[in-house]
Amino acid sequence: MSELRFPEEKPLLRGQDTEMESADTFMSAADTDWKEHDIETPYGMLHVVIRGTPKGNRPAILTYHDVGLNHKLCFNTFFNYEDMQEITKHFVVCHVDAPGQQVGASQFPQGYQYPTMEQLAAMLPSVMQHFGFQSIIGIGVGAGAYVFAKFALIFPELVEGMVLINIDPNGKGWIDWAASKLSGLTSSLPETVLSHLFSQEELMNNTELVQNYRQQISSCVNQSNLQLFWNMYNSRRDLEMSRPGTVPNAKTLRAPVMLVVGDNAPAEDSVVECNSKLDPTNTTFLKMADSGGLPQVTQPGKLTEAFKYFLQGMGYMPSASMTRLARSRTASLTSASSVDGARPRPCTQSESSDGIGQINHTMEVSC
């Protein structure tokens, strides 16, 4: 098991005395370079925002948010983080909003059938075709991570890599369904969604972060549309994946994957289980210390460093600075696979960078 440690040399968030930027700030962060599009797909319209233009054969970075959020609530803090600009200048970035979840979305008419999770995944090729993307690197959180995993299983040739945060590969059984229904009867929809996004400790402490998201989920996401998305996510099926060699004709994600979860996140056990279903030769497991349910919001600096390292492992950005990444050589390798295992792209990180070369084995990362 390889371990990476990330010492902080500057605050993760601009306001050192707050857990997150004010609600007004993170909802109205500079969006002048972003262009909005409504794209027709086989299962309805998708609202997306895009910055940059496709750069040759380089993949686009495509994001998909969690249930209860939209691209702004989920990703603004991460993509506005200072060090993230070094990455985004090399890629076109496209944020996808699940149907009806964007700010100002019209309410769906009564009787509207919300797309299934499989159909949400099947809408993404229309986005790629619209912009001329040849391939993508996906960043998904929660429900968005599930959508990207399903997309990669259906269209593996379109995916070069994925960062899956808080993914739950399991469907909901009837007991889970009943518990969800009971929760809906005793709690408001925003409170039910908050229990999905945050740990019980975070909710009990009623942190400023939780308070901000409670307000934004209630005011910035159409509640009727959110209920439809929430119901569909809780009707999802198992992602039919198995680690190669464990069952005959095992099917799993072929592209490099970085799994991310906070060590105090409600999705921790689910992400650990997902890791057991993936190919150890191209999977990195990042468990973020002192982080709850939204590591991309509370720990954007650490996640940016890990993402930069992940991209370098795919052969991109070989000269990108890694000034805040300290690598520990004291941890042991746990994967049975050789470090000479193949990746779709050669890793360009050299031994001179503190001695870590190719990352061709499963790593568990603590930071």
Swiss-Prot record:
- Superkingdom is Eukaryota
Matching SUPFAM superfamilies: alpha/beta-Hydrolases (SSF53474)
Keywords, comma-separated and alphabetical: Cytoplasm
Pfam families in the record: Ndr
Biased composition, class Polar residues, residue ranges: 347-367
Q: Where in the cell is it found?
A: Cytoplasm, Cytosol
Listed GO biological process terms = positive regulation of ERK1 and ERK2 cascade; signal transduction
Which spans does this entry mark as compositional bias, Basic and acidic residues? 1-12
Q: Please provide, in alphabetical order, the Gene Ontology terms of the cellular component aspect for this entry.
A: cytoplasm; cytosol
| Region annotation Disordered: where it falls in the sequence | 1-21, 333-367
What's the family? Belongs to the NDRG family.
- What role does it play? Contributes to the maintenance of intracerebral BDNF levels within the normal range. May enhance growth factor-induced ERK1 and ERK2 phosphorylation. May attenuate growth factor-promoted ELK1 phosphorylation in a microtubule-dependent manner.
Listed name of the protein: Protein NDRG4-B
Please state the gene responsible for encoding this protein.
Answer: ndrg4-b
